From Swiss-Prot:
Residues of the N-acetyltransferase domain: 10-177
Gene this protein is translated from: yoaA
InterPro entries: Acyl_CoA_acyltransferase, GNAT_dom, N-acetyltransferase
Xref: PROSITE patterns: GNAT (PS51186)
GO molecular function, one term: protein-N-terminal-alanine acetyltransferase activity
Protein name in UniProt: Uncharacterized N-acetyltransferase YoaA
Organism: Bacillus subtilis (strain 168)
EC number of this enzyme: 2.3.1.-
Family to which this protein belongs: Belongs to the acetyltransferase family.
Amino acid sequence: MFPILETDRLILRQITDQDAEAIFACFSNDEVTRYYGLENMESIEQAISMIQTFAALYQEKRGIRWGIERRDTKELIGTIGFHALAQKHRRAEIGYEIIPEHWRNGFASEVISKVVSYGFSALGLSRIGAVVFTDNEASNRLLLKMGFQKEGVLRQYMYQNGTPYDTNVYSIVKPRE
């Protein structure tokens, strides 16, 4: 059963084909994809394919991706989740994006906090990593604010529109008990 997580303002839930328009709106937006290592979506079919990829990720126990829904408007405003899940090594990488109209409202902090906590408690992770374009100042600041530590730079690690970009590597580890 797909886990539903809740915060004061948001519900993290399974993404379905009914969310295709919102996923398309997110991943066809230059401001979102600029630091994503992904070309802009050009069709709703690409959004449906991404939703199916998210479902397979969960079914195959390689990760999980939640849709971020506002409680007040029921609007899907982005996604967050884990990929590169390695249960044996108790680690995963976190990824997230929010549609620009909803930036600067504290939503990213709210969901990162919830998902990191879930990763440590429910999934038994001891390490959560993040890889972020060095140019993505907002996400770099956010991860530090959320308690992640910068571990280094991966040179020419991701390509965006055929151009290589350096990325910062971050991690947060479960506090020792």
